[in-house]
A protein has these predicted regions:
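Patatin-like phospholipase A catalytic core
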Residues: 138, 151, 155-220, 368, ...
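Glycine-rich loop(s) and the adjacent beta-strand/alpha-helix scaffold that form part
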Residues: 11-14, 18-21, 25-42, 251-252, ...
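N-terminal Rossmann-fold NAD(P) dinucleotide-binding loop
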Residues: 5-6
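Conserved redox-cofactor binding core of oxidoreductases
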Residues: 45-47, 51-61, 71-78, 90, ...
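Conserved N-terminal glycine-rich FAD pyrophosphate-binding loop of Rossmann-like flavoproteins
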Residues: 26-51, 82-95
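Short, solvent-exposed loop/turn and secondary-structure capping segments
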Residues: 30-34, 93-95, 102-107, 210-214, ...
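A glycine-rich dinucleotide-binding beta-alpha-beta segment and adjacent secondary-structure elements
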Residues: 202-205, 224-228, 259, 264-267, ...
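FAD cofactor-binding and catalytic pocket of flavoenzymes
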Residues: 64-81, 85-92, 96-112, 119, ...
């Protein structure tokens, strides 16, 4: 039960509905699960992966293309699906962006501006069936639920100094002001301004001050403990379902939370046109049927797709015929890092950190890159963040430092105290040959076919990586570091499932305006089984340059509003095919 599950449960119980939430993992709350000093254990959180799903029970199979056999992911690597109450919303960092207005209409904008031939062969990007303006009230509400700290750039159409001048217009300022800058962010502002960019504070759902959200949930100011990503917040400072929604849900009439409940499949009527409920395994391994009038798939994005494929909800995507919708347009995030190393006069103190704090700019994001000149479609942000580091999580040493011995110890000490990094987070387009389906060879711990991921980097994303990393390295030169470490993806680079990059997995059950090209309609409702809804990052037709959580939360509120105001009154398809 992550952000989507908590939001939907809150909204539907507000409407007087009875909601049963089935969570595959244990119950968790700030007290006692994230309490100090229990939670600040690098070995437990970042090595043993206490808050992540068990790959022994449930994992994915991965391959680069459709001509090879996939192999299961046996170690947590490229991304980190959560488990337990709070889901990935409890162990995220806190970066909280809104998608840009142009992100909703990327295909239309590209084709209108540059012609249809601008899209490379096999690129399958699609417009969202909704607009930024549709979601603005829900972006706003989610920020206020989360106590997001930041600085608006355009409020009610008027540009405001200090914010993002390229953002969509917002109806009001952030609920809290920006977090304090750490040293790397101060240097980032200096370099970005020198290059003519427009830096602004990263919107962060890490509270910069005391706050009470619209539900009455309290937050305290972040103390820069450095344990955001991989961990639950010990201080009620990082927004999470546990701290910002569940306190008003627990004990509420009509709300039934069942933990250690692994959903196996969605049950359908004999004609496959309606869901009747789900089957799940309880903590004792007993299979139970839970009837339901409405089924909301609120798992991690990959597993929403997995459940749809296992249950026969919608036609599975066929990469050969390009037909079917469930599994198509899987996408990811294009991430690269550049580390800067300084002498002893620059004290970075990497052990301090705030998950979403720092600085970024959008001058290279959205539609501000001309693909006829840069050679790629999309964009990205360059940012400075310091979410916290430590010896167990790893210390990036300067170029030339050996990997062992006394010289390594010296280099690690210098790097820990006198270095920081900038990151390039790029968009990732979708393609005909990047998709999700059921693996024919491997099964999970419950006897079900594993979800199979077919994905690799395409030339578009490799060129984008090289372009954006080049811009980041140009910024670094302004600061005169002793050394710079970090490279862009090289031509022919392959996706590496073993190396952590980002938990921003998107697509696979996308929203659209045509049942032949999308699994869900504009309200996140299945075209094929209208009492099944699947809000989440799985609905993105491709990925933009931002973290997806702000968009995921807004879509959950958008979906819940449609259920409350339309579906309950007149059950059935909310959009006619």
């Amino acid at each position: 039960m992550g952000w989507v599950g908590a939001i939907i449960a809150k909204e539907l119980t507000d409407a007087g509905m009875n909601v049963v939430v089935l969570e595959r993992g244990p119950d968790r709350d700030t007290q006692p699960d994230f309490a100090y000093p229990r939670v600040i254990d690098e070995l437990e959180g970042s090595v043993h992966r206490k808050y992540l799903q068990s790959l022994a029970q449930e994992t994915i199979a991965i391959r680069h293309n459709g001509t090879t056999s996939a192999v299961p992911m046996r170690r947590m690597g490229s991304f980190k699906p959560g488990t337990g109450v709070g889901g990935a919303g409890s162990h995220w960092s806190g970066c909280h962006f809104r998608a840009l207005p142009e992100d909703f209409k990327i295909r239309s904008i590209m084709e209108q501006k540059y012609g249809k031939k601008i899209l490379p062969a096999g690129m399958s990007i699609q417009d969202f069936p909704i607009t930024y303006e549709d979601l603005e009230p829900h972006f706003d509400h989610f920020e206020y639920v989360c106590g997001t700290s930041g600085k608006g750039g355009i409020i009610n159409g008027a540009q405001v100094a200090g914010g993002n001048p390229f953002e969509g217009s917002r109806s009001r300022e952030f609920p809290l002001g920006p977090n304090p800058d750490y040293l790397g962010a101060e240097y980032f502002y200096k370099a970005a301004n020198a290059m003519g960019y427009h830096p602004y504070p990263i919107p962060a759902s890490n509270a910069s001050g005391t706050y009470v959200n619209p539900y009455g949930c309290q937050m305290g100011p972040c103390n820069f403990c450095g344990f955001c990503y991989d961990y639950g917040c010990l201080n009620y400072s990082k927004a999470s379902p546990n701290a910002n929604i569940l306190p008003v849900l627990r004990g509420r009439k009509g709300f039934d939370l069942r933990t250690m409940a692994q959903v196996m499949k969605v049950n359908l009527t004999p004609d496959g046109k309606m869901a009747t409920g789900v089957n799940y395994l309880d903590a004792q391994g007993r299979e139970t049927e839970q009837p339901a009038d409405i089924v909301i798939l609120a798992a991690f994005s990959l597993y929403n797709v997995h459940l749809m494929l296992l249950s026969g909800i919608g036609p599975a995507y066929d990469p050969v015929t390009k037909t079917g919708t469930v599994g198509k347009n899987y996408s990811y995030q294009n991430l690269n890092r550049v580390s800067l190393f300084f002498d002893e006069t620059v004290h970075a103190n990497q052990f301090m950190g705030i998950g979403g704090g720092g600085a970024t700019f959008d001058d290279l994001n959205g539609n501000r890159n001309d693909p006829t000149k840069t050679g790629f479609i999309g964009g990205g942000i360059i940012w400075a963040r310091q979410p916290g580091g430590g010896p167990v999580r790893g210390i990036a040493t300067a170029p030339g430092v050996p990997g062992w011995g006394s010289d390594w110890k010296k280099g690690a000490k210098e790097a820990m105290r006198h270095s920081f990094y900038f990151e390039v987070q790029g968009s990732c387009m979708s393609y005909d040959d990047a998709y999700l389906d059921l693996d024919p060879n491997y099964k999970d711990g419950f006897g079900r076919p594993l979800l199979r991921m077919t994905f690799d980097w395409h030339e578009n994303e490799i060129i984008a990586s090289q372009y954006l990393v080049g811009k980041a390295q140009d910024m670094c030169q302004v600061l005169n570091p002793l050394a710079i470490k970090g490279d862009a993806k090289k031509a022919g680079s392959h996706y590496n499932i073993n190396q952590y990059q980002s938990t921003h997995t998107v697509g696979g059950a996308i929203m659209g305006d045509n049942p032949k090209t999308s699994a869900l309609n504009k309200y996140l409702q299945s075209w094929d089984v209208p009492n099944v809804f699947a809000p989440g990052a799985n609905a993105f037709p491709q990925n933009n340059g931002y973290n997806p959580t702000g968009m995921v939360g807004a879509l959950a509120y958008w979906c819940a509003k449609a259920i409350r105001e339309q579906y309950i009154k007149n059950p059935g398809p909310l959009v006619q095919a």
